C-alpha cells in the first residue's frame, strides 16, 4: 500500500548501503549518470523481489521513495518540481527557487533524492510543518491530523528498539529523540524533546520540527560519512537541539 511505501515497510528487497558499490542504491545512482536514466531506474525498482510480508519489517528504501515520486507524477500528470511549485512553494511564499534533479526536464524528476533549497526556505518549510500544514494566512494545505499520523511511528520489526521503543520512523520522517537507553548524557532522555519530526539526510542534513514547542532547527553539514552510527552525530544533534529547547523555555 502507499502507507507501507511511505513508512518503508513494503517488505520488498532493497540494499541502501552507501558504501557498497553493488547495493541497490549504488545501481540507482549509476543509472542516473547514464542516458535513459528514468527507464533504467524504473526497471530496477519494479524488478525487485519481496523479502517479507508487507507491513511486518521496516527497512529504509530509496527505491520505495522513488516509486512514491513516480506515483505522484502519474497521478497528477505533472513533474514533481512543477507539482511542488504549485502546491506548496508559491503558496508558502518561499524566498528562492528550489532545484530538483530531473531525468527529463518538466516530465520526470528524481523521486528518491536530489531536491535542493536554501537554508532559509528549508526553515520556512519547517514552519509550515510546525503549523500542522497551514499557511501563514491560515489556509490549510495538508489534511488536518496528517502530521500527528506522521509522528505515529511504525511498530514494524527493526523500527522498535531499546533506544527507540516507540519506533524510529513514520510518514517519511524520523524519530531522533534522545535514545531512551542513553546514559550519562545531558539533557537526559526524560528531559529531551518529545514528538519531534526529523528529516535526516545523508552527510548530516537535518530539519527538526517540534510542533509542541514551535521550534524549527535546520542544520547543514559535511559529515565524513554518509550515514554515521546513531550513537554519534544523530545523538549529538538530539542532545544539542533538546538543550536549545530547554534554554528557550
How should these model regions be labeled?
Residues 3-6, 42, 46, 69-73, ...:
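Non-transmembrane alpha-helical segments in soluble domains
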Residues 8, 64-71, 113-135, 145-146, ...:
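Active-site-proximal alpha-helical segments within enzyme catalytic domains
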Amino acid at each position: 500500500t502507499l502507507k507501507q511505501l511511505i513508512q518503508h515497510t513494503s517488505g520488498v528487497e532493497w540494499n541502501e548501503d552507501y558504501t557498497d558499490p553493488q547495493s541497490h542504491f549504488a545501481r540507482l545512482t549509476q543509472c542516473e549518470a547514464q542516458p535513459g536514466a528514468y527507464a533504467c531506474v524504473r526497471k530496477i525498482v519494479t524488478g525487485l523481489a519481496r523479502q517479507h510480508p508487507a507491513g511486518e519489517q521496516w527497512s529504509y528504501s530509496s527505491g520505495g521513495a522513488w516509486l512514491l515520486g513516480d506515483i505522484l507524477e502519474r497521478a497528477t500528470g505533472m513533474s514533481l518540481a512543477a507539482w511542488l511549485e504549485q502546491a506548496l512553494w508559491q503558496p508558502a511564499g518561499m524566498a528562492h527557487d528550489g532545484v530538483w534533479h530531473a531525468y527529463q526536464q518538466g516530465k520526470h524528476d528524481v523521486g528518491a533524492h536530489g531536491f535542493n533549497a536554501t537554508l532559509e526556505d528549508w526553515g520556512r518549510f519547517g514552519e509550515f510543518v510546525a503549523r500542522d500544514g497551514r499557511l501563514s494566512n491560515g489556509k490549510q494545505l495538508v489534511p488536518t491530523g496528517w502530521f500527528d499520523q506522521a509522528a505515529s511511528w511504525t511498530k514494524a520489526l527493526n523500527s522498535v528498539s531499546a533506544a527507540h521503543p516507540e519506533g524510529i520512523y513514520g510518514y517519511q520522517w524520523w524519530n531522533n529523540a534522545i535514545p531512551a537507553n542513553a546514559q550519562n548524557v545531558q539533557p537526559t532522555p526524560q528531559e529531551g524533546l518529545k514528538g519531534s519530526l526529523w528529516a535526516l539526510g545523508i552527510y548530516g542534513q537535518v530539519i527538526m520540527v517540534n510542533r509542541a514547542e514551535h521550534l524549527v532547527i535546520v542544520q547543514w553539514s559535511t559529515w565524513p560519512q554518509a550515514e554515521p552510527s546513531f550513537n554519534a552525530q544523530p545523538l549529538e544533534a538530539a542532545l544539542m537541539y533538546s538543550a536549545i529547547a530547554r534554554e528557550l523555555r
